[in-house]
Amino acid sequence: MKLSPREVEKLGLHNAGYLAQKRLARGVRLNYTEAVALIASQIMEYARDGEKTVAQLMCLGQHLLGRRQVLPAVPHLLNAVQVEATFPDGTKLVTVHDPISRENGELQEALFGSLLPVPSLDKFAETKEDNRIPGEILCEDECLTLNIGRKAVILKVTSKGDRPIQVGSHYHFIEVNPYLTFDRRKAYGMRLNIAAGTAVRFEPGDCKSVTLVSIEGNKVIRGGNAIADGPVNETNLEAAMHAVRSKGFGHEEEKDASEGFTKEDPNCPFNTFIHRKEYANKYGPTTGDKIRLGDTNLLAEIEKDYALYGDECVFGGGKVIRDGMGQSCGHPPAISLDTVITNAVIIDYTGIIKADIGIKDGLIASIGKAGNPDIMNGVFSNMIIGANTEVIAGEGLIVTAGAIDCHVHYICPQLVYEAISSGITTLVGGGTGPAAGTRATTCTPSPTQMRLMLQSTDDLPLNFGFTGKGSSSKPDELHEIIKAGAMGLKLHEDWGSTPAAIDNCLTIAEHHDIQINIHTDTLNEAGFVEHSIAAFKGRTIHTYHSEGAGGGHAPDIIKVCGIKNVLPSSTNPTRPLTSNTIDEHLDMLMVCHHLDREIPEDLAFAHSRIRKKTIAAEDVLNDIGAISIISSDSQAMGRVGEVISRTWQTADKMKAQTGPLKCDSSDNDNFRIRRYIAKYTINPAIANGFSQYVGSVEVGKLADLVMWKPSFFGTKPEMVIKGGMVAWADIGDPNASIPTPEPVKMRPMYGTLGKAGGALSIAFVSKAALDQRVNVLYGLNKRVEAVSNVRKLTKLDMKLNDALPEITVDPESYTVKADGKLLCVSEATTVPLSRNYFLF
């Protein structure tokens, strides 16, 4: 066959397209992924026939599917489909704009070549349409004023050239093309008063009036034709005018030019206005605007925007970040940013803001206003964009901290790629591969295995932490695994979570300042939940799957969510309670814990852990902030790629069933959003002793950042930045002329290759291991850091998730109460962030 890589890529696209055709043929309304695959694969098939042109296929692509053939969200998610195909005259790009633009598609064309039956349009029954638009931006019907408080002048400009001339917003106007004639003296130190990154175009012979405003900041002109190079002052003005005359630049004095200042006055003749909706489309939402997170019912409102309207930094042809404009001159790498993310909406436990993010030496250097201080006000001193600065465009995107999954069974290395593709940048857990022990418990037991696990993950582009086995009632072996590199220990009932083991393990933890994670005794073999709590002796401990379906004292382990020294977490199979949650759990549990259906006691053990009422209570406890962390329990009763999506599914369900939180207004869900994002970012970082390095979008922390389109928030990131470098991203056909043609999928980037993956990441170990210099002994490329400040933690240290209700559980009915109030919600029959987005 002699297949090239691009042909293999297209085979995957074809398979997805044929799958979509099969679903369409049986009357299933397609989701986003299916619709894209069908349209793109059909374009390739028609191109192969060689009978249609690119233009004809661009038109045909708009007719294949209609609104009735796709789920209601799809027309809002799908703006264009691009694919490259082989035509008789070679490889060509086909772009289908607005592919879902009619009520019904031409199904015979959609199924052309598949030999599948064409379904009747009656199969696509009308359904109750959901008017929720994924990722929509909600703005007030009002305008913003640009460049307020600046000196302004209106000048007449005539083009005497024979070709078009286009001038960008931040180009120093005195420096423009010599064939534009106007009063250059009055234009000194001025630029166009138009939206940042837009332009004014002069066709040959055009004569038009333009409004100019003064440059701000240090008021230094650089670049252009260098006729006015230097600070704006009278001396330099005369030198500039001499250069204008001597170099033949068009100049014509305009004595009666209108001059004044821009101001907060709708009638000011110098003002330029932009409607909030247009502003949001160009630069992303601003203060007071709201964004829907994916297809959930959650609305995030921008609390603060660091941008100065009219001086936004945007990159591209004719845009702002160019030499002497948004990009400064004469600032060496030492004082300019390595990378800037422009105009991003940041969703973090600290707040929901809009800002530029500056990255330097792999760290978040600053959050605020970036740009060129020579022409802009408000540029942070450590956020200078220079010739050594890379730009990541954040306009219209959401940035969050990389997620932390702190309940990982290292069963297979492939879970790493699933994790990073979903937005996870830190993994904490234990294991050695698909051994029986690792399938059930998060323990890397021996020092040799600890060394090998640290070495085997050394080049992988995530932060890693490994937990040793803590199930021992004597101390010696625990000291050894901690010195070998364990950053925590795991107590698990499958190894023994008896009071003696608990007490010994916590005693060792106090000595080494590490966290203890516990899966308590479902069997109640050595005692009930109160006996385990007594064994804690008020010492800090992290309780895994604190509801109990994932394991723990039956039926009342959930009581620990009200204990001050306990840091409780959920695992994601029970997030949230849905109509199918109970039915899937029995077999999941039997496989995970090496149980036998033929043994009655094994079945009884399994059934004792699966309780609808306690799972419902878990929903409520997460919503009130009594459960502080959500993690996966990867491949051992948990899904590593769904930590983020299931967190937001829980938030959506709870808002739908209980309404807004008291801390939220009727207009936004900011507090609920901040509470839930803390569950997989800052709180697991605090609980495990590395919040000084990762866990939030804050200055000084590792630049582990995830970028999302609002419409795909919580499902499929646009880009994952690891240690300041792009590590994983949504990229299309590698052979294509541009990066967007299908198949677009999450792919490893340069930040994962060679030595970069390790260099951009951290291996977390104990202080004892760092003192042993395990990084040198093991030959690790990764930065190695010790966890710390764990042993004095309490629930009150869990950000926005510090509630301490008194919890009771009826041992017969399993009903749960908190502070005397029944905790009960119904199961969800549908959840967001699911069928609209995923192929399977």
Curated annotation (Swiss-Prot):
Its EC number is 3.5.1.5. Pfam families: Amidohydro_1, Urease_alpha, Urease_beta, Urease_gamma, Urease_linker. One of its GO terms (biological process) is urea catabolic process. Carboxylation allows a single lysine to coordinate two nickel ions. It is an enzyme of class 3 (hydrolase). Substrate binds at H492. It catalyses: urea + 2 H2O + H(+) = hydrogencarbonate + 2 NH4(+). InterPro entries: Amidohydro-rel, Metal-dep_hydrolase_composite, Metal_Hydrolase, Urease, Urease_alpha_N_dom, Urease_alpha_subunit, Urease_AS, Urease_asu. Ni(2+) 2 binds at K490, H519, H545. Keywords: Hydrolase, Metal-binding, Neurotoxin, Nickel, Toxin. P-hydroxymercuribenzoate irreversibly abolishes ureolytic activity, but does not inhibit the ability to activate platelets. Also inhibited by acetohydroxamic acid (AHA), a chelator of Ni2+ and Zn2+ ions. Residues 402-840 form the Urease domain. Was isolated in 1926 by James B. Sumner. It was the first enzyme ever obtained in a crystalline form, demonstrating that enzymes could be proteins. Homohexamer. Other oligomeric forms may exist depending on pH and presence of salts. Urea hydrolase involved in nitrogen recycling from ureide, purine, and arginine catabolism. Is known to be highly toxic and lethal when given by intravenous route, producing convulsions and other signs of central nervous system intoxication associated with the high levels of ammonia formed in the blood of mice and rabbits. Is neurotoxic in mammals, when directly injected into hippocampus. This is Urease. It comes from Canavalia ensiformis.
